[in-house]
């Protein structure tokens, strides 16, 4: 049996994150020191970091059941953010009056919970996870969707920008969350409702946020009474939209009759083509040569890895399928070689190594025949006083969890293309009795 190095590493990262960042005495996720994503004197992580970790741990359940009990601990940690007013998670631990509730954060929480519910072998836990995911998606559909302009708002506050911005991240994440939930439910009427909503999200992105190369721009914001396009382009917006479209491709039973659904394959392939253009905005243009690293961090790029992977299996006959898989594997190889922190078994955040240290700047310049100068990033370092470049580098939960999710996408490619690889050659049957073992894309 050949070894799936990506799967082994992804599982190791998930385990190391739990050992490093989970406090079993309080069921909280935090850090021993102030780092990016933590808040207050106890260095507790904001819900975004915990959500990405929940997604990574849920991914692990596809391959092994050994993290099921640990996922239950993460679920308990997420409960500390839960608002009984909104039936969703606050950005930080809930207290009376806390109305800091982001739709994109909650969509990622729902993705993790729905995926875990799909794969867990414990029916009681499954019901708890899926119920919470349903509550979140209900809020998003009923309150997050802008009834006049379409799209999902960034935040539950309705007092104007930036809270009311119609963002690609909130809209695409919500689509994926709805589809992951649809896969975890048995009720065909609920499935149909969720699939229809997800398709509305995808159509809205297609009609409002694409650039000329089918890359997703960041969103719309209201300025002087007019909606203005923010043309910033990040890996996660395009990647998550591709994942949503790939999932829709596998749910044909529920997409029949949806307006313009016949355009879905073209939408998906066009976006994949843009995402693979190494001369485009998703790639670091300081790189020279045929391979360029993504111009982003791990917890954004993980969504592009997943999007390209799911596309390659949703449309396996596309001429872009194999290049998409190669890109996912190449980015994962770079990740493991340069961003891994050997001592902790965790990961830095930035693919731009020149933001980490002078030594890694030199490695980047050598690898890519580049000429970058060291640009220290405070988010890669312990949050303390003093010059940024003198602060110690440190791992973060969100950076490491994002790396794990990138590795799971690479692992899935190896497993499918070489079924003798990896920890599990037969994918686990969902606990609710369905025999669909291709939940990643269908």
Curated annotation (Swiss-Prot):
GO cellular component terms listed in the entry, alphabetical order: cell surface; cytoplasm; nucleus
Residue stretches of biased makeup (Polar residues): 416-429
InterPro entries: 6-hairpin_glycosidase_sf (IPR008928), Glyco_hydro_76 (IPR005198), MUG_Protein (IPR053169)
Pfam families according to UniProt: Glyco_hydro_76
Main location: cytoplasm
Subcellular location: Cytoplasm; Nucleus
Alphabetic keyword roster: Cytoplasm, Meiosis, Nucleus, Phosphoprotein
Region (Disordered): 416-442
The encoding gene: mug191
Organism: Schizosaccharomyces pombe (strain 972 / ATCC 24843)
Protein known as: Meiotically up-regulated gene 191 protein
Modified residues (Phosphothreonine): 361
Record-level GO BP terms: carbohydrate metabolic process; meiotic cell cycle
Alphabetical list of PANTHER family matching this protein: MEIOTICALLY UP-REGULATED GENE 191 PROTEIN (PTHR47791:SF3)
Molecular-function annotations in GO: mannan endo-1,6-alpha-mannosidase activity
Role: Has a role in meiosis.
Superkingdom field: Eukaryota
Biased composition (Basic and acidic residues): 433-442
Gene3D superfamilies given in the database record: 1.50.10.20
């Amino acid at each position: 049996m050949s070894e799936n190095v990506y799967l082994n590493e992804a599982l190791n990262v998930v385990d190391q994150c739990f050992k490093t960042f989970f406090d079993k005495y309080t069921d909280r996720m935090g850090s021993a020191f102030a780092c990016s994503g933590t808040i207050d004197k106890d260095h507790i992580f904001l819900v975004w970091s915990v959500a990405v970790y929940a997604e990574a741990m849920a991914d692990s359940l596809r391959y092994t059941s050994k993290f099921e009990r640990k996922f239950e601990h993460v679920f308990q940690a997420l409960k500390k953010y839960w608002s009984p007013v909104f039936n969703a998670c606050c950005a930080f631990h809930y207290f009376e009056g806390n109305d800091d509730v982001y739709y994109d954060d909650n969509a990622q929480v729902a993705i993790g919970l729905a995926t875990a519910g799909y794969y867990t072998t414990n029916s009681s836990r499954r019901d708890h996870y899926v119920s919470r995911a349903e509550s979140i998606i209900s809020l998003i559909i009923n309150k997050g969707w802008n009834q006049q302009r379409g799209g999902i708002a960034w935040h539950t506050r309705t007092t104007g920008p930036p809270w009311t911005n119609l963002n690609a991240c909130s809209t695409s994440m919500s689509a994926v969350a709805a589809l992951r939930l649809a896969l975890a439910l048995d009720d065909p009427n609920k499935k149909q409702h969720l699939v229809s909503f997800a398709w509305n999200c995808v159509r809205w992105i297609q009609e409002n946020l694409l650039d000329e190369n089918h890359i997703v721009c960041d969103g719309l914001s209201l300025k002087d009474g007019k909606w203005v396009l923010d043309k910033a382009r990040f890996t996660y917006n395009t990647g998550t939209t591709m994942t949503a479209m790939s999932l829709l491709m596998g749910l044909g039973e529920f997409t029949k009759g949806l307006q313009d659904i016949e355009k879905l394959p073209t939408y998906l392939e066009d976006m994949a083509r843009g995402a693979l253009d190494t001369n485009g905005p998703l790639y670091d243009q300081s790189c020279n040569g045929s391979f360029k690293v993504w111009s982003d961090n791990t917890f954004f790029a993980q969504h592009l890895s997943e999007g390209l992977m799911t596309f390659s299996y949703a449309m396996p006959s596309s001429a872009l399928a194999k290049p998409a898989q190669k890109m996912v594997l190449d980015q994962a190889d770079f990740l493991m070689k340069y961003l891994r922190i050997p001592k902790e078994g965790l990961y830095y955040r930035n693919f731009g190594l020149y933001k980490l240290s002078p030594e890694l700047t030199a490695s980047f310049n050598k690898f890519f025949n580049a000429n970058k100068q060291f640009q220290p990033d405070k988010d890669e370092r312990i949050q303390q006083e003093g010059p940024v470049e003198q602060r110690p580098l440190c791992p973060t939960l969100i950076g490491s969890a994002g790396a794990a999710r990138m590795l799971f996408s690479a692992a899935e490619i190896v497993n499918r293309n070489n079924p003798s690889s990896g920890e599990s050659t037969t994918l686990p049957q969902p606990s609710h009795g369905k025999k669909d073992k291709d939940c990643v894309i269908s």
